[in-house]
Amino acid sequence: MVEIKSCCKSFGSHCVLQDVSLPIPDGKIVGIFGASGIGKSTLAKILCGVLRPDSGEVCLDGKLLVSGKTSYDRRRGLAIQMVYQQPYASLDPSQKLGAGLRELIFYHRLAADRKEADRLVQEILSQMQLSAEILTHLPRQLSGGEAQRAALARCLLLKPELLILDEATSMLDVSTQANLLALVKAQMLPRGGSVLLISHDRALTDFYCDSVYEFDEEHRLKEVRR
């Protein structure tokens, strides 16, 4: 379980997060919605270690992951992965998809040799409903839906405990959006993983999430549906 406790974050005199607390239980989808610039992505970046809170803390399975006084525990932080609104930001523009996936596998020691790495690549492609031919493609050669599933594949290879979707479906059509979220549920929830779905769309979070929170104008987070 991931838990955010009383986190605050400001940039200069501009408060972005004000005493934000949020439990993300195992095996659940938690939704956050709110206007652009209200603090949703800032919270996601704190969870991933891109930003540090000014105060408060984030815990993973009851153990401190980051606080206003401690650096991000990057070894344990691998348990939290994020898919961005722009999938191409997660993909090396000069590297073919297959090479990128194998590099990720060897970097994190997920396989002992090329044969095992190739098996893992084929397995994740099948799970993401991607054809093997895209392994020879550069990111710019992928459609928006393919690029988003490729970015998702990179995250799921690491078998995260928490997957954050930061407006990750906002640029997709309704059918592709539904397909992507179905893939996420199938890969994360059965093994006890959790999902944080961040969106400006209240209807999306209401439909897919077990609990829903809203950022108000004071940059506080309040539960609106359980």
Protein language model regions, located:
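Conserved catalytic motifs of ABC-family nucleotide-binding domains
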Residues: K159
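ABC ATPase NBD coupling module
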Residues: L65-Q81, Q95, A99, Y107
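Conserved ABC ATPase "signature" region
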Residues: K115-E133
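The feature captures the beta-strand-to-loop junction immediately N-terminal to the Walker
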Residues: F33-A35
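Conserved ABC ATPase signature
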Residues: L138-L142, E146
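Helix-to-loop junction immediately C-terminal to a conserved catalytic motif
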Residues: C48
